[in-house]
């Protein structure tokens, strides 16, 4: 069974610090492990969803993981002792509905493939939480990190947030509290940010290509967490051309120190792979070996595949490197045939930009408590925010009014009045009251009173309450 009593650093007393070298942080001894011996037991869950696609020519199509599966089998990774394969399960509607509210409903958008993809992440989590393996990697699709709590269709290839559904399952079944999600996809995970933005016990860290140059156009330093969770959202927008050197610098100098301070019970890697130099949708220069070293540094408990669309030139090699790294095996010989060390060398301008960005982030992180205090003083009893969300795959323009109940000493509810236009189901309006998973009876009752008040005032066709560790989702 998972040992919840140890901190992040304590649970990773053995921290990988380089290719084929392990340093014990308690003794300082450096070990040179046998390259054929897995240092960590690893569970693998595959769900390639060969029957699901957005279109025949879309990047998110059936054969996306075909070559990856072939590579893993040909390399004999499934024959290595301590690497076990698990079957995915079908995520149940109750768990999904404790995270998401759909317009007109979730059934209109969520297919069985989406439920099995989320179920693959859940199967990986179960394997770790039951103590059957040290770590697990869910190689599943469709992806999920652009899916927000409100769902008006597909956006950024995502419909439901598979990591969020997995974390909900872990909190509900195993009592996990403090969670860190480190998103290494090239696109900012605006959906994961949305789901966790008001939760001070979930740290979301995303380093991605600068949103001024890439979809979804978000993910900047001022997106620092909601008014009751300042410092809980860390967006690190990296310049096009960032390579292995830049990612390692961000990991060592910024991400790892923040994780040490946050002290999560568990670390999740949203393992997007479209930072790769060959990916057709982005402009970065990361290699398969760079991804493996990143995983080596992070020491995540669970990894869940997100993006990555260089189906033949990147994914087979990147996933091989990640598996070897998570298992504590040598990954030094994982090299893509198309790799050119001269062509894909990070420029000095990019390095200087990243140095400056890290310096700014260190100042902001150090000032987070003062920023949180100022935010609370300025918010009053109820904080509100008005903004729009666009669904690129379904053409829906969503308008949102969000409110957060501010308490001095606990996490309050947040509500969303969502109105969607131009979608296939016509205009949709939904009011959703999200009760925090940490809620006590007073908070829960306040939330229900507020939701009933909103219903009496009108303005939506549906009124929904989401109580993640209580009754689940229900209509008023």
For every predicted segment, state its role.
Residues 24-476:
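HDAC/HDAC-like amidohydrolase catalytic core signature
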Residues 1-18, 22:
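Extended, non-core accessory segments
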């Amino acid at each position: 069974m998972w040992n919840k009593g140890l901190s992040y650093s304590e649970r990773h007393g053995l921290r990988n610090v380089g290719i084929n070298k392990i340093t014990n942080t308690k003794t300082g001894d450096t070990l040179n492990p046998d390259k054929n011996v897995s240092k960590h037991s690893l569970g693998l869950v595959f769900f390639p969803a060969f029957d699901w696609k957005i279109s025949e020519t879309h990047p998110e199509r059936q054969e996306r993981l075909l070559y990856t599966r072939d590579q893993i089998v040909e390399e004999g990774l499934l024959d290595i002792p301590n690497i076990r394969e698990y079957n995915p399960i079908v995520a149940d509607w109750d768990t999904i509905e404790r995270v998401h509210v759909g317009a007109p409903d979730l059934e209109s958008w969520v297919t069985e493939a989406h439920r099995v993809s989320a179920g693959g992440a859940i199967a990986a989590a179960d394997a770790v939480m039951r103590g059957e393996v040290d770590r697990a990697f869910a190689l599943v699709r469709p992806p999920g990190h652009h899916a927000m709590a409100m769902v008006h269709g597909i956006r950024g290839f995502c419909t439901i947030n598979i990591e969020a559904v997995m974390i909900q399952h872990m909190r509900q079944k195993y009592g996990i509290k403090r969670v860190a999600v480190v998103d290494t996809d090239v696109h900012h995970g605006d959906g994961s940010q949305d789901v966790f933005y008001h939760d001070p016990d979930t740290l979301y860290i995303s380093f991605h290509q600068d949103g001024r140059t890439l979809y979804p156009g978000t993910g900047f330093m001022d997106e620092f967490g909601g008014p009751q969770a300042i410092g809980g959202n860390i967006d690190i927008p990296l310049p096009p051309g960032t390579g292995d050197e830049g990612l390692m610098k961000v990991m060592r100098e910024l991400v790892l120190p923040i994780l040490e301070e946050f002290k999560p019970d568990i670390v999740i890697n949203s393992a997007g792979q479209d930072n790769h130099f060959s990916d057709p949708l982005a402009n970065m220069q990361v290699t398969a070996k760079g991804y493996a070293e990143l995983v080596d540094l992070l020491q995540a408990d669970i990894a869940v595949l997100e993006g990555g669309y260089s189906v033949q030139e990147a994914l087979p090699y990147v996933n091989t490197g990640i598996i070897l790294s998570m298992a504590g095996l040598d990954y030094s010989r994982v090299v893509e045939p198309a790799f050119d060390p001269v062509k894909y060398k990070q420029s000095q301008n990019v390095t200087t930009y990243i140095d400056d960005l890290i310096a700014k982030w260190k100042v902001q992180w150090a000032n987070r408590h003062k920023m949180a205090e100022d935010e609370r003083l300025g918010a009053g009893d109820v904080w509100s925010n008005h903004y729009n969300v666009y669904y690129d795959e379904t053409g829906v323009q969503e308008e949102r009014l969000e409110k957060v109940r501010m308490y001095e000493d606990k996490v309050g509810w947040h509500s969303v009045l969502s109105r969607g236009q131009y979608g296939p189901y016509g205009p949709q309006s939904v009011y959703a009251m999200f009760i925090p998973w940490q809620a006590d009876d007073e908070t829960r009752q306040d939330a229900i009173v507020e939701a009933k008040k909103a219903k009496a005032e009108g303005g939506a066709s549906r009124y929904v309450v989401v109580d993640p560790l209580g009754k689940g989702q229900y209509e008023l």
